[in-house]
Amino acid sequence: MRLRSTLAAVTLAAAATVAVVLPGSPALAASCPDNGWSILDGRTGQFFNGNSVNIRTGPSTACVAVGQGQASHQVMLDCYKSGENGTWSHLYDFTTGKQGWSKDSLLVGAGANKHC
């Protein structure tokens, strides 16, 4: 009985100390710039110029990374916009099913050719 009470107390203490920021929460929204986009380019191919290229919720490193692209992945480029330290393209990674923003300097041919 004492062991069960101790485990319950430890579990409650651990749960109380964990801070979670959920997508769409004010804290996350405040740090991530405008992320609106449209399918304007539509080109598909292998556009990551390396491996482990972050795919983010917006055009900034302050935005959450939802996945990583690899050079072998097939993607569709949607459009680009100015963001943190240059331009970023919105894309869909067919290999992983993830979509989001990647910095154009990490994409073959500087990313999408249509502005959002």
Task: State the predicted function of each range.
Residues Q68-G109:
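SH3/SH3-like beta-barrel superfamily modules
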Residues A8, A14, A62, H73-M76, ...:
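A broad, structure-centric signal for solvent-exposed, well-ordered loop/edge residues
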Residues G58-A65:
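Short alpha-helix capping/helix-loop boundary micro-motifs
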Residues P23, N49, E84-N85:
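Short loop/turn segments at connectors of secondary-structure elements within structured domains
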Residues S5, A27-T57, G69-A71, A112-C116:
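SH3-family beta-barrel domains
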